[in-house]
Amino acid sequence: MSRRFLACVLGIAVSLLPLALASKPVYPDASLRALSWRLIGPFRGGRVIAVTGVTQQPSTFYAGGADGGIWKTTDAGHDWQNVSDCCLKVGAVGALAVAPSDPNIIYAGTGESFTRGDMTTGDGIWKSADAGKTWTHAGLDATRVIAKIVIDPHNPAHVYAAALGHVFGPNPERGVFETTDGGTTWRRILYVDNNTGAVDLIMAPDNPEVLYAAMWQIERKPWHLESGGPGSGLYKSSDGGAHWTDLSHESGMPSGPFGKIGIAASAAAPHRVYALIEAHGGGVFRSDDDGTTWQRMYHKANITQRAFYFSRLYADAHDANHLYAPQAAGLMISTDGGKTFKSRYAQGGDHHVMWINPEHPEMMIVGNDGGATISLDGGISWSRLDNQPLAQFYHVAVDDQFPFHLYGAQQDGATFEVTSRDTTGYGIDPDAWHMVAQWEDGYAVPMPGQPWITYTGGGVAGLLERYDSHTHQKAFLGPWPEDATGHPAAELKYRFQWVFPVMISQHAPHAIYLGYQCVMKSADGGMSWQEISPDLTRNDKSKQQLSGGPITIDATSVEYYDTVFALAESPLAKGLLWAGTDDGKVWLTRDDGKHWHDVTPPGLPAWATVSTIEASHFKTGTAWLAARRYRQDDYAPYLYVTHDYGQHWQKIVHGLPDDESSFVIRQDTRDPALLFAGTLRGIYASFNGGDDWQPLQLNLPHTAVRDIAVQARASALAIATHGRGFWVLDDIEPLRELSNAALQANAFLMTPQTAWLTDGQQDPDAARYHSGLNPPNGVSVFYLLRQAPDDATPLSLSFTDSRGKLLARYSSNAAKSSGMRLDVAKPGLNRFVWDMRYHADVTLQPDEQVVATGPRVVPGTYQVTLSIDDQHMTRTFNIDKDPRNPSTPADLEARYLLLRDIQDDQIKIATTLQHIDVLRSRLAKLQSSASDVASRERITRWLSELDQISAALEEPASDAYLVGLQQPSGIQDRLGTVTFAAGESLLRPATGDIQVWKALKAEFEVQSAKLQGIEEEIRVDK
């Protein structure tokens, strides 16, 4: 479809549009400026992998999210504020340290050292010199993962960093690094080999020249984790890192190979060192002679389990026998020097890191898979987690309800459904989130037409959970519900990934598809299944073995490989299915699985994970795919398009950074050339079918965007981030209407999307109350300007109904506005939100001007006209009723007319009061100049009567807030109560509303008659 034809369909002036899709360029940032991402939430925590505190400020702490940036609290965890969105270009923060000698200086290391199969890497070290207000990059970007930072207690420019390295492949930027100039330059001072990095690092509490470093040989692939090898070991330096000694073979140490190691020391015993060592015969080891000899103190599995995911130790600075080991079972604590450990509760689960105030050891912070939690009493009580929007979602689905809902599974949380706007309040409160499944991974898909029924995939048995939110019934379905824990993928009847795809057919709602090594289909809502494809993977048995070795086996479905990882169904052709595998294959069937064709793009590297396939909404043979290979140390984006059912593919990555892996690609549902792509660090848009890409980041934090969904009716974009929860971009119509001609015009008005007459408001500060942000309740009007208007050539927006009656006018010149001043008039894209209210074109006293704002209009067709100079542009839009509202058009019309009548009376009262003020002033002057007593007495009586009329019309102003409890309210105030009663709901006004209005109207007429009588006396007296 040509852009010219699409413009006609949308009612846009053809002369202002480019001639063809291909002519759409990369647009300047100002052309997107007025768009804004809206945080939905949840505020229920998320994975935190780095924590620290400020010794001198006991209530100040910092936390680093797994892909959520840096957060700060100054009230011991009651509230958290992000301090890194201003500056950091990555979200994974794995190390934090505050300079002991200057609490304003903070170093942050990026990348995750708790090497989950889904971990996110970083870009080195960042530094703040103003307590987190601003940040600058401080080097080591090639390391990708910084596990620990240690700062010289006397010199904040002297810093050591433990660099784990690439994790997914060998690289030389590993080991321990040192800077003496605050990060301007770095020197590698400990290096083993390209497969081994530094995972922990401590400084002796009594001597900054003494360092202990844990080196870890680690490699991850999509199909395997290898934790440990000959490169792993424990090292010591006694001269600030100039020379190192390998302690791994000292007396009492376990035999190798070693895996991950955690280290701790206490100022209370300067010669004592603790080490938690992953090894055959590993456990907690202690040296009381500076590392010369060692003794194993503890070896039970509650400390040594899943070493790659835990293995940190912390010692109390005041009590060397008091030791902490964050673990899955809780915060493991020893009070006898490591001989025994007991679990202590802390908020959250899967605890990873902690910081203990060295001067007040009862004050501590713990980071875990639920967030950051603080204790000020030694772990007796802990701060809340539900104030941190750090959720890691894998996917997002939307339904067709109003408002539409979002669905997704949160890592280390559960699977949730949430509304995109809360029409009962000012934000999306925590009680708007509803759990629909217990799984922390995978897809959550609502049934078309029955969104109260969801299907969610997850678990280690490839289960599919069906949940009915009406009846609260759940059913666990699946082709082969056998627990796979501890088994290699090669032994399974069905291989499935941790995040296996779940797809409900758009053509047959009870048809469900799953991706295992083959495609599974159920025609009866999951009760029975059949294989509709052969094994579509490469089926390399060497990549289907147990993971975790050579020391600790870790067999979960996270590393299961050779599986179908992406499914897509054509919305245009029943039976046309696409399948992509995690080992780099793409398949197509046009007969619902009877025959499959290998349509793998020739340029797609082997073993790439095909994470998303998008079937076109406009052409059956067109599809896009997004693939990634960052877990093989290849961070390039892989996006492809085919227009002939996969016979030919074109790579489409121009404009994307070459180090941002691609997760998802989606097509707009109305503009065939408009595409969206989610990457490792953000989101991009293409306006020409993928030929060129540009950032659509706007105010979105830099974090991985794992999935994108276009909600057609709302013209909204919903995204799942892997560290900052759900976000929505409301009203993407401006993206559809952008064009060269629109940008070159002096002004260009875009077509407003349908607005909804509903309740609920937007509080821009909702996040302060741990709530998601509502959209503005009104009509969003977008317009482009080449330059800002001035008072000589003001810009105005006028709103009229279908009969041409003016409802409101806003102008950049306040004197020409019937409502508030139009102050959104800058070069580039602007957004104005009309509140859908009638605004009377009257000028009243400031304290009375509020009555000029009338009721919200009724559903119907409206126009907005933009005027500047001699140019006038008009667009038509609709306002629809909330479909949940039972009111009829006649009900809403009756409500509107009543409220307009009340408003008319309120305006009359306001103008009457203004007139009385003028009359008072005149009488006061006459009284001062009157020569006879009789005249002065008459004027005094008139002034008194005017005061009585004023008091009857409106309660006198007072500095006392509760003065209204001491005197009757006026007619104006009582009319306000009726306005509130009739206007708060979108229903037919109650009989009482009408009766009270009529009674008050009659009272006003009585007072008006009294005023007329006084004025007649004054006229006669003259």
What are these model-derived regions, one by one?
Residues 91, 806-853:
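Glycine-centered tight-turn motifs at strand-turn-strand junctions
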Residues 466-467, 781-785, 790-810, 861-865:
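Beta-strand-rich binding/interaction modules
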